[in-house]
């Protein structure tokens, strides 16, 4: 049983963590967002699974391109980095009813449900000052289905970038 749970956790972690439901963003109001035209990825960050890292980068790239930012690995205006973390959470679920026959003891069951909560963080740093200028954070319960996690990731990125202060669609 324990091996089955560990295997399920491993599948969830490698299949695709995280992404969606609760999304928050924060930005530096003094940052010169209007002057940012190019970006580059900071190497060595993102998801623990290379497939997910590729999907995540492609999804962020598409959103940045739609906002008018272009990739420039030599002299970018901003650096982009992502972080993915997971945490196991357990909930105790009790069910039953209070009285048995002749007002005796009740019947009930208790079970433990294990979830994997994931967090996706997207950070932007000004290339000149090296200061963080924008952060988007999404948290959700991961699924054991990679396609569901990809949907959650894209939904979270849509919510994040709806509040991104660069581009024609930006809402500040």
Regions found by a protein language model. Give the residues of each.
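Positively charged n-region of N-terminal signal peptides that target proteins for export
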Residues: 1-7
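Bacterial N-terminal signal peptides
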Residues: 7-16
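Residues embedded in well-ordered secondary-structure elements
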Residues: 9, 30, 69-71, 111-113
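A structural "domain/chain start" motif
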Residues: 19-67, 75-84, 88-92, 168-172
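C-terminal/domain-edge helix-coil "capping" segments
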Residues: 20-32, 112-119, 126-134, 139-172
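Surface-exposed short loop/turn segments
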Residues: 23, 67, 78, 82-131, ...
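Secondary-structure boundary/capping motif
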Residues: 36-40, 71, 132, 139
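Short helix-to-loop capping/linker segments positioned immediately adjacent to catalytic or ligand/cofactor-binding
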Residues: 66-71, 145
């Amino acid at each position: 049983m324990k091996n089955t749970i560990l295997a399920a956790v491993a599948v969830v972690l490698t299949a695709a963590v995280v992404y969606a439901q609760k999304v928050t963003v924060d930005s530096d109001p003094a940052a010169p967002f209007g002057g940012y035209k190019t970006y580059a990825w900071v190497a060595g960050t993102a998801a623990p699974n290379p497939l997910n890292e590729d999907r995540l980068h492609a999804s962020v790239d598409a959103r940045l391109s739609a906002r008018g930012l272009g990739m420039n690995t030599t002299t970018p205006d901003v650096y982009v980095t992502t972080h993915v973390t997971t945490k196991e959470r357990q909930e105790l679920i009790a069910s039953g009813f209070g009285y048995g026959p002749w007002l005796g003891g009740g019947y009930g069951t208790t079970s433990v449900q294990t979830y994997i909560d994931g967090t996706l963080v997207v950070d932007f740093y000004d290339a000149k000052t090296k200061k963080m200028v924008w952060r988007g954070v999404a948290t959700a319960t991961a699924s054991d289905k990679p396609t569901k996690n990809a949907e959650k990731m894209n939904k979270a990125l849509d919510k994040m970038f709806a509040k991104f202060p660069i581009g024609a669609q930006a809402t500040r």
